[in-house]
C-alpha cells in the first residue's frame, strides 16, 4: 500500500494499493487497462482538494498531470485550452498576468482545471459554467476522446453531468475557456460590492478575493481541509419566509426560479458550532462552513462531525445540508449525503 496523505488536502492518513502520476492520455489508457485486467477500482484525482477518504482505497489512484495552456483570440474573445492537470489558481494568475480577464473571482480555489467542471466551481458571483466553452473527455472503455459544449455539461449549482453520466470510466483531459475582451467586473458578493465598477481592475478583484479567502479559510498545507464542506442550501420562498420570521438578518440570495439560496456557513454559525470537535475533526473557528483535520482525524471522525452539524442545523432551521465534498470508500465514490444521514 502507498500513502495517500500528501495527495489530498484533508491530509487524513489513508493508503491506496498504488498511486500513479499520468502525464499523457496514453498513460491514462494504459493504467486503466492494467487495472481493469486485475479487477482493481480506479480513482482519478487532480489535487485531491474536494475528497474525503473514509478508508484505505483498495485500488489504483491516478493523479492527472496533463499539463499545458494554449491561447487563441479573435476580435471579441480570448480562448484558452487548458489541460486537466494544470493548477486552477496558477491558471487564474497566469491569465491576469497576460491581460486576460474574467477568472479573477475564482482565484485561490484549490484543485486543478480538470476538476473544475465536475463541481462547477464557483465563488463571488462567478461559476465555471460562465467561462466554459467546452470540456474534452476521454472514454477509457473505448479510448475515444470527445468534446462536450457548455449545454451538454448540464451545469448546476455544484453539479454537472460529470457526477452522473460521465462519472465512471471517463476522465476530463482538458477544458476550453472563452473570456470576453470587453471585460465587465462582477461585484455582487462580500466586500466586492464596495468597489466602483467604473475604476476597479481585474487585478484588484483578484487581490481582494485572495485576501478574503486567506483571511477566513485555513491553508490546507497547515490545517487539513477540503474547503467548503457543505453546499449552500436552496429552499422554497415559503420556507425562507418562515425562517426569516425568527432570524431577521438571515443572509439570502434569491434565485431565478423563485427559490432562495441560504448561506450554509451562517446557519452553522447560528448553532454555535464553530470550534466544535469530534475526535480529531473540528468545525473551523473562523469559517463554520469548513471542517478541518485538527489533529490526526480519521475519515470517520469527519463523517461523525458532519452528521452532527447536519442534524443540529436541521433541528434549528428545518434545512438539511448536503456535503459538497466527495466521499471515497475502499472501492470508490459513495453517496456522501447517505453516509452522513
UniProtKB/Swiss-Prot annotation:
Its main location: cytoplasm. Its cofactor is FAD. It catalyses: UDP-N-acetyl-alpha-D-muramate + NADP(+) = UDP-N-acetyl-3-O-(1-carboxyvinyl)-alpha-D-glucosamine + NADPH + H(+). GO terms for cellular component: cytosol. The active site is at 158, 228 (proton donor), 324. Its EC number is 1.3.1.98. GO terms for molecular function: FAD binding; UDP-N-acetylmuramate dehydrogenase activity. It comes from the Bacteria. Residues 12-182 form the FAD-binding PCMH-type domain. Keywords: Cell cycle, Cell division, Cell shape, Cell wall biogenesis/degradation, Cytoplasm, FAD, Flavoprotein, NADP, Oxidoreductase, Peptidoglycan synthesis. Pathway: Cell wall biogenesis; peptidoglycan biosynthesis. Pfam families: FAD_binding_4 (PF01565), MurB_C (PF02873). InterPro entries: FAD-bd_PCMH, FAD-bd_PCMH-like_sf, FAD-bd_PCMH_sub1, FAD-bd_PCMH_sub2, MurB, MurB_C, MurB_C_sf, Oxid_FAD_bind_N. GO terms for biological process: cell division; cell wall organization; peptidoglycan biosynthetic process; regulation of cell shape. It is found in: Cytoplasm. Belongs to the MurB family. Cell wall formation. HAMAP family: MurB (MF_00037). This is UDP-N-acetylenolpyruvoylglucosamine reductase. The lineage of its organism: Bacteria, Pseudomonadati, Pseudomonadota, Gammaproteobacteria, Pasteurellales. The gene is murB.
